[in-house]
Swiss-Prot record:
This is Periplasmic trehalase. The gene is treA. InterPro entries: 6-hairpin_glycosidase_sf, 6hp_glycosidase-like_sf, Glyco_hydro_37, Glyco_hydro_37_CS, Trehalase_periplasmic. It comes from Salmonella paratyphi A (strain AKU_12601). It catalyses: alpha,alpha-trehalose + H2O = alpha-D-glucose + beta-D-glucose. Residues 1-34 form the signal peptide. Provides the cells with the ability to utilize trehalose at high osmolarity by splitting it into glucose molecules that can subsequently be taken up by the phosphotransferase-mediated uptake system.
């Protein structure tokens, strides 16, 4: 008799093969114009490869406060010629590296500081920011690290001068709330273009981001557009949804239990789940010096291993967090690739459900059933392997130690967000989040103070939205509204004082931007703008919408939870 776990594995394997059948990844070519992605030219190389020792020397010389500056610089002529000139000149007496860079490169311009009109409400400020944050890059310079896109798009702001994958979904929520459905459609079209061009959506539209993706929110983007355009949007983007799924599942057909390949893992019982992965194992061009220093701080590990784990953490969007580290105080203990993240697998469950819905809309019932079967298999795997029964919350799985991890993070809310959680478990997650993560200014990312930006005391807009939506999905409205009210109060207090919205917030109090990480606090800020607009509509009745957060808590909101949230722990 065949053991049940082997039988499940065989059936799952057949379902995956059927679902992926006929889905071809076309890694189309780059050109300086966002043209037909089926044209055949070479994939562009990132600046650390194009410029070799020159890139390394400039970054190590720390000519610019931000390592991203030179990664975004545009060569004024063929990089091979610039590199040849550099090799000829660098050992000459009086050689000035900064002068050489200034002559041979066009540096990115500092963004003009936006000064909003006086007296604007929060909503008016955000609506006024959309055109300020909008970019159009149909054509780029020949050796630019920027990748062209066919339609205009909204950037996060600050040092982030390009489009970012998972940021954009939360930005699009705000665009839709402001009535800019044309911009939503343009951004979905851009991501569809990237999938056709590169086989996946890169971290951002830069050559140095092509080796990884980010949390897969494309299905949510298409579902959002479908709210406005109906099932036509699902049918239009079904091919791109299939290609993205093929990217995440690449290599699964040949995996044996206990094996991993790039982004996909097969556990010993045959369950198929996913992890974050970057195809390269070198320092990130945009954080070159920092990555080299991190690798040098732990000589007991191969530098390439650390580099890939740093890059893979960037793919997760949580760069960086104690979630990925053995020692929260030592970044070089990061091991992202040995961790199966609960949020990633919840998002891929949503992708499988969206594929089923889109296939049904296109009239392919057989394919819809296959994707539904894959979603059901993933849901069972999440419940079996990504639930910490001892602690009472969803968590990540540790491949290295073959066990569930104990740490509670805001990622525990993702199964609720995609409606993949068992009801009794959702109640336990709500209680845990309220007891351990809820702070005066919103939901903390974790309860650990590591100095990393995706840890306490920071709270991030996308995680507030995921939590609020997920909790409401399971009737946990009191906690959902508490997260919403506290975070909005934080945003409003910061705006009242500084007249801006920022990338992240310190949720241990209200009115303070977050800290930690590799770069100063950024303002703008795309996903905060989007989530703020959506949350304003949660706290104010439709018949009387509010343009700012009320000074007193609306009576329509539930009372404050009786349990006082605990302070973040060291």
């Amino acid at each position: 008799m065949i053991p049940p776990e082997i039988r499940r594995s065989v059936l799952l394997q057949k379902a995956i093969k059927l679902a992926l059948a006929g889905t071809l990844l076309t890694f189309a070519s780059f050109s300086a114009t966002a043209a037909d992605p089926s044209s055949d030219t070479e994939t562009p190389q990132p600046p650390d490869i194009l410029l070799g020792p020159l890139f390394n020397d400039v970054q190590n010389a720390k000519l610019f406060p931000d390592q991203k500056t030179f990664a975004d610089a545009i060569p004024n002529s063929d990089p091979l010629m610039i590199l040849a000139d550099y090799r000829m000149q660098r050992n000459q007496s009086g050689f000035d590296l900064r002068h050489f860079v200034d002559v041979n490169f066009t540096l990115p311009k500092a963004g003009e500081k936006y000064v909003p009109p006086a007296g604007q409400s929060l909503r008016e400020h955000i609506d006024g920011l959309w055109p300020v944050l909008t970019r159009s890059t149909k054509n780029v310079e020949k050796w630019d690290s920027l990748l062209p896109l066919p339609e205009s798009y909204v950037v996060p702001g600050g040092r982030f001068r390009e489009i970012y994958y998972w940021d954009s979904y939360f930005t699009m929520l705000g665009l839709a709330e402001s009535g800019h459905w044309d911009k939503v459609a343009d951004m979905v079209a851009n991501f569809g273009y990237e999938i056709d061009a590169w086989g996946h959506i890169p971290n951002g539209n830069r050559t140095y981001y092509l080796s990884r993706s980010q949390p897969p929110f494309f299905a949510f983007m298409v579902e959002l557009l479908a709210q406005h355009e109906g099932d036509d949007a699902l049918k239009e983007y079904l091919p791109q949804l299939q290609k993205e799924y093929a990217y995440w599942m690449e290599g699964v057909e040949t995996l044996q239990p206990g094996q991993q390949n790039q982004r996909v893992v097969k556990l010993e019982d045959g369950s198929v789940l996913n992890r974050y992965w970057d195809d390269r194992d070198t320092p990130r061009p945009e954080s070159w010096v920092e990555d080299i220093a991190t690798a040098k701080s732990n000589p007991n590990r191969p530098a390439t291993e650390i580099y890939r784990d740093l890059r893979s953490a960037a793919a997760s969007g949580w760069d960086f967090s104690s979630r990925w580290m053995d020692n929260p105080q030592q970044l070089s203990t990061i091991r992202t690739t040995t961790i199966v993240p609960v949020d990633l697998n919840a998002l891929l469950y949503q992708l499988e459900k969206t594929l089923a819905r889109a296939s049904a809309a296109a009239g392919d019932r057989a394919k819809a059933s296959q994707y539904d079967a894959l979603a059901n298999a993933r849901q069972k795997a999440i419940e079996m392997h990504l639930w910490n029964n001892k602690e009472g919350w969803y968590a990540d799985y540790d491949l290295q130690n073959n066990k569930i991890r104990d740490q509670l993070t805001a990622a525990a809310l993702f199964p609720l967000y995609v409606n993949a959680a068992a009801k009794d478990r959702a109640v336990k997650v709500a209680a845990a989040a309220q007891a351990h993560l809820l702070q005066p200014g919103g939901l903390a990312t974790t309860s650990v103070k590591s100095g990393q930006q995706w840890d306490a005391p920071n709270g991030w807009a996308p995680l507030q939205w995921v939590a609020a939506e997920g909790l409401q999905n399971y009737g946990q409205d009191d906690v959902a509204m508490e997260v919403t009210w506290r975070f909005l109060t934080n945003v409003q207090h910061t705006y009242d004082r500084e007249k801006k919205l920022v990338e992240k917030y310190d949720v241990s109090s209200t009115g303070t931007g977050g800290g930690g990480g590799e770069y100063p606090l950024q303002d703008g800020f795309g996903w905060t703008n989007g989530v703020t607009l959506k949350m304003l509509d949660l706290i104010c009745p439709q018949e009387k919408p509010c343009d700012s957060v009320p000074s007193t808590r609306p009576a329509s909101l539930s009372a404050t939870p009786t349990k006082t949230p605990s302070a973040a722990t060291q």
